[in-house]
């Protein structure tokens, strides 16, 4: 369970970073001290930050549930670390591309590719475990 716990903590911490970015762009009193006087927020920038945050929330829970189930059924710890590292790198790339950059093509595509590779690795492992 330690592999899942570690990556759940890392992904949760990154989720908070992305959430604070959204709060900042919305002009929340929580992040008011970060605002520059006369700062104008681009609505597209806010929308992208919201999607960067939302996208992590859409993928991470399913990944972590599948990860925990595999870990509890005795999957290789090395394999789980590899899948989690790939998935987490993808989520970081995608989240940064969406939430902090205006032009993000390569980072965004690379992020989704790594996200899918990590998730597909777990899916295949789960199916093989069921079939064996």
Predicted stretch roles:
Residues 54-67, 119-120:
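Core segments of transmembrane alpha-helices
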Residues 93-118:
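Interfacial loop-to-transmembrane junctions
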Residues 123-132:
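Juxtamembrane boundary at the C-terminal end of a transmembrane helix
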């Amino acid at each position: 369970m330690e592999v899942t716990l570690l990556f759940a903590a890392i992904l949760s911490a990154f989720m908070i970073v992305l959430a604070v970015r959204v709060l900042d762009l919305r002009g929340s009193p929580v992040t008011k001290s970060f605002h520059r006087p006369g700062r104008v927020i681009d609505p597209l920038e806010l929308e992208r930050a919201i999607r960067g945050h939302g996208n992590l929330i859409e993928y991470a829970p399913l990944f972590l549930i599948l990860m925990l189930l595999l870990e509890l059924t005795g999957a290789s710890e090395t394999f789980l670390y590899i899948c989690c590292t790939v998935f987490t790198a993808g989520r970081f790339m995608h989240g940064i591309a969406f939430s902090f950059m205006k032009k993000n093509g390569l980072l965004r595509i690379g992020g989704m590719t790594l996200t899918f590779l990590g998730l597909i690795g777990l899916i295949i492992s789960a199916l093989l475990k069921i079939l064996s």
